[in-house]
Amino acid sequence: KARPQREAWVVLACRGNKVLLERRPPSGIWGGLWSLPEFPTRQHAAQWCREHLVGGSELQPEEPLKHAFSHFDYDINPLSVRCAGKAPALRDDDRYRWYDLAAPAAVGVPKPIATLLQRPRR
């Protein structure tokens, strides 16, 4: 029988060589790992960018990525945006951090997200 499908939109907020990562909640999928900010719809993602990024460009859809979990298939829809920075509300603390693609920090990142981060950026 067909496996359940789920989808999410993730934001690749790029500032120079850095991408903004968000720590996931301790429970649930990829609990406690660093990932891209994730949203149930493109509209939610766009709204978050307007509220939390400084000098954000238009959102550019990138090629989706499929990932299979044991119980369902996950479609990840990346939206990339160039920005000058993030709103003061998103402090560099235990929830958000800039991840340098040129010198990756040793943080736990889910494999599909690592795959996205390794794609060449325009």
Where are these regions (language model features)?
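Intrinsically disordered, low-complexity, charged terminal extensions of DNA damage-control enzymes
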Residues: 1-122
